[in-house]
Amino acid sequence: MFASWTPTCYINLGPAYLIDLAHTRYTVQASQDVLLLRNTTVTSHKFGPDNLFTLKFYPGGLEAVLGINQVQFTDRLLPLTQVLPVALLAQLKQPHTFAERVALVEQFLVRAFRRSAHPDHYVRLVHDAIGEYQASGLQLNTSLVAERLFLTSKTINRYFHRVIGTSPSQYFALLRVRTALTAFVADPPAFAPSDYGYYDRSHFAKAVRHVTGQPLPAAKR
């Protein structure tokens, strides 16, 4: 998996496994639940059939719902108990169905969100900026996104570093690659690089290699 800046919780319902975070390898025991920011490439290695229940937050989502800023988690593998209550994790490890686990998580997150006083100003503007970029068909540059939100380029850059941990230009480029690569994998013959702001197939392939480290035919989402 390549970078997405989406805080992701891995609740382990099965055996131990290995996980590579950039150039560091960790062993996650059967009893361990972990959190990754996914600001870099992540590779997992299973010893057998894996059984992971995952929960992924939108960039800035941890802060919007739980009041926890994600920037502190950059390049780290953390115990999930730093984010979710031990009691909730114990419930999720019981022999429930997938739908029952989803319901448990939803109940907890909805209660946590309702306890939040007001949406953070920084988080709201970053989400608005991402929405503007997506609404433009991934075509706008950072300056134009900032202009639509009545912000300066310097201000929007500061907000992205504060909420996500990277610059808006880097995040938008990553979002564009992920979106385009999803479309390419789904239907390669119908894929048109220009639909995603790339000049041609070569330009797209170069972006994919830069983000994934793999040539286009072998790249995975």
Language model region names:
Residues 156:
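Nucleotide/phosphate-binding loop and acidic/charged catalytic motifs
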